[in-house]
């Protein structure tokens, strides 16, 4: 799986977080956030840090603080969706950086 594919998967999983929250399955939503961070985001984190450390730091905060708090404090579907949408914008930027990194690797070989 390439870095950009992992980002696409993360975005899909975050959409599911909003859906689970909307279904009042807050624990499922929170678990999905943590699993997505540990199983998917951490896998591309190294490549991203080299390109944009601040972006990685922002996303880590979103995954570990902002989104879980929006869920645990029961801020409502719109608030959770707003956090996810902000994360999606950052993930789009991360995806572009990973596409560039992949191109760079192919040019080397």
Model feature map: region roles:
Residues 1-109:
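Soluble extramembrane regions of membrane proteins in the secretory/endomembrane system
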């Amino acid at each position: 799986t390439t870095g950009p594919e992992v980002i696409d998967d993360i975005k899909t999983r975050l959409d599911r977080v909003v859906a689970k929250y909307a279904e009042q399955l807050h624990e499922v939503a929170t678990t999905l956030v943590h699993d997505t961070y540990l199983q998917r985001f951490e896998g591309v984190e190294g490549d991203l840090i080299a390109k944009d450390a601040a972006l990685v730091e922002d996303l880590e905060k979103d995954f570990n603080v902002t989104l879980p708090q929006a869920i645990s404090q029961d801020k409502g579907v719109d608030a959770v969706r707003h956090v996810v949408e902000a994360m999606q914008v950052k993930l789009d930027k991360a995806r572009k950086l990973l596409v560039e990194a992949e191109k760079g690797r192919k040019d080397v070989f």
